[in-house]
């Protein structure tokens, strides 16, 4: 006897979806579902052996399809194909499935045939099914007993049917309704399968790195399938016996038509179809082979990206493919200008891994976190059929290569800044007396030097000298002129230089006119490019120091002497720095350098005092500092006149001989080398060579000043005679200095530096261990 029985619609409007006959169950999905192919359902008695032995009645289970679990198909043909693949018959897209009472048959096998279905429609529908979505398996099931419908061996491969202990517990859950198991109430049994679903483009909110196949249907209604090729390889294999049944990739799902018109799906013997399982939640979940419904977007494609890759596209966040979360595992982003993926109708869509397009600049990389990817800078990319963008332009077609004119601020030529006076910061009128000054400071300095004024500061010699307040304190203004380097001799020297250049130019022009064959003009005297020793001495000359003497307090010998000692200590320090800068001096032995400084410190201070007094006060006053000038009134103080008389002698001799600045620098250097120990220096030969060098420099300075060779030797004799006389002046000054240093009753303070020098020098002078280097014999 044939175990199959046709499933035909009833002739009455029966809302029940379950019809029971003697040898099997006939399932009717309402009247409104008719109009398509007829489903033949046969029930095998061996499929549910355990259930038939326990109860002779039919146990009814509800089929619950959560809302949103199946995507809405817009075409009626596609909906029919979906219904056929699931073993159901649906007439319209908006048709509702009434699943109040779905019973399990006692025997027979379920088979599927489509004798009245259009073959061409089936081929197109099955091809579309490969891109559609189906119901995933509930991850919360714990491998309880599952019922698999086994069709004929020629049509479908066999599936396994296991009945666990949980299914045996269903007997205890039967109510009074004929022993049937009711999992849901009547109002919960009606639901929509193909409803217009609005799938969100975002992730359903599942945990990261969780398989989309394990989505909870009861919690997330929008969760569908995800591409199997995008997941790990474990999803492509057959699950273990203890794991849930996962959809498999069929090698060939193209339908085959037998001679009698039945539809046959070919598959290998070792591949099992998805099973209809009974879960812990006591509902039946239908699982079909994993397919993906791929939406047809205009020119936007999906691109796979592994963690660490950089994808620069229109969207930087993970998207969901038709409602499936892609936040776990691989991520799919919208990208631009990627190749379209060629798909076959009998295969599932495979998302190939496409390398990301290199980004445009390193700055974008650093902002987006480029990882360890090696990127190519924008401008070197060359994609066929794609416009190459250059740096700085959005598109060559939108903005041609036009050289933008430079900004007016960068090209605007501003004139040179006005030159300022080095004394009062007013606008300078030129270089006066060797310094860039204004006309007012020029006249002031000339009158101050020639008028022999004795300026005294009413403050602390730190008055502000500017354009407005330059007339408030002449003493500070005069001090600032000296600090700037103003010198009356600079004007005369400049005139001589200009006169010499004019004479040389005139001589060259005359020679050129006499010899017209000469095309190259060579000056008679080429300027010396190598700096002379005199020019170096001018550079290293120490600045004028201030004593810090308060002129508002009544003068006294003790206060003046103490101030002079403090000033002398700072001048000694400046003299040490100056000596080390003299060319050749540092080549001497270190002990020789210290010895020469200890013997000559008073020579240097006295000669510099005479020069300042000669240049600033015409040798009538002693200009120790701009703020400490000893006039005739101060010279009359006790113990002051005799010492001032010796110092005025030096100033008067310089004034009488009209010593030039170059001559003064050479003479000052020779005074550093004017005294040595009787035993000689450790580097005596080098010392003699250095001393002879500066004697020759003094002769050059004399020739430069006089110009007439007949008077050069005479002037050299006068200047060297002055150097010899300095020994007597310094000897008198040292005797008075030693006396005040040893006499504690005078209470004259000495700075530490000066006290150390005097302490080391006293034994040498007392023993007579000093040799004077004189130019002339007495």
Curated annotation (Swiss-Prot):
Phosphothreonine-modified residues are where?
A: 8
Q: Does the keyword Lipoprotein apply?
A: no
List every stretch annotated Modulating: 1-420
In its UniProt record, a GO molecular function of this protein is:
nuclear receptor activity
* UniProt modification remark: Acetylation by CLOCK reduces its binding to glucocorticoid response elements and its transcriptional activity. Increased proteasome-mediated degradation in response to glucocorticoids.
What the record says about the induction of its expression is:
Binding activity reduced by FKBP5.
Placement of covalent cross-link Glycyl lysine isopeptide (Lys-Gly) (interchain with G-Cter in ubiquitin)? 419
Q: SMART domains attached here?
A: HOLI, ZnF_C4
- Occurrences of domain NR LBD (ranges): 525-759
What is written about domains in the entry's comments? Composed of three domains: a modulating N-terminal domain, a DNA-binding domain and a C-terminal ligand-binding domain. The ligand-binding domain is required for correct chromosome segregation during mitosis although ligand binding is not required.
Protein name, UniProt field: Glucocorticoid receptor
Taxonomic lineage of the native organism: Eukaryota, Metazoa, Chordata, Craniata, Vertebrata
Q: Which gene encodes it?
A: NR3C1
